[in-house]
Amino acid sequence: MVDRYIQGVIVFICSLLFVCGCDEHVDISETGDEDDIVTLLERKAMDSLFTNNAYSRSLLRKNMSQTADSLSYYRLMNVYSKACFAASQFDSVVYYSRIILHFCQKSSDSPQIHDLFSATYNMMGNVWGRWNFPDSAVVYYQKVYEHRKQGNELSYLPDICINLADGNVHKSDYTDAAYYYRRALFLCDSLGLPDRNKFPIYYGLGQTYMELRDFDLSNHYYEMAGRYFSQMSVPEKFTYLNNR
């Protein structure tokens, strides 16, 4: 029994190395733990969405054709829709998202299905945001939030609240925007997430209270955001200094 367990571990480790080191020969159907390999493939494809979009699509198409598990197939399809989004092919995002949602709607209720619902509605919200329909985007982001609460990947909840806040900013609904930014702060604390995650929240609150003409609170949150200046990326530093 122990020998068989060790063999299984060795096969799984070799599969991971195979995926990482030999991109063009990934074969998801031959791996021992498909869920872990799908997660790795999702990350691998996401890493190349903007730098090598064609590679991401090729990797995803190949493994979608090889997986025998429906959930794995539609998880990879969701990442494929993100590749379409990165290429500004928004109609394709909607097309694939509708296919995934149909699968989710006919599937048995589970945390994994709620995570997939959430990820798919998020893409729909992103598309409607890019099409400059913030009302529709917010409706989708609310669905994202409700499904994610019932899923496994709760660490995404603060980011979803930031999307809801940003959507309300674009609607000029600054009161609701402030509510969702504050909700994001609460979730960061309750989920024990790194303080670094709070920078965009503080920055968003600074902007929101500026629009509400509460300059004291605006300055307070800009100062809070500034505490993370050394940890900001170059674009974040530029945005912060340009608006401060």
List the predicted regions and their residue ranges.
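Bacterial N-terminal signal peptides that target proteins for export
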Residues: M1-V9
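A subset of signal/propeptide-processing and intrinsically disordered low-complexity segments
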Residues: Y5, F18-V19
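Bacterial N-terminal signal peptides
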Residues: I10-L17
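A "functional boundary" signal
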Residues: G21-R244
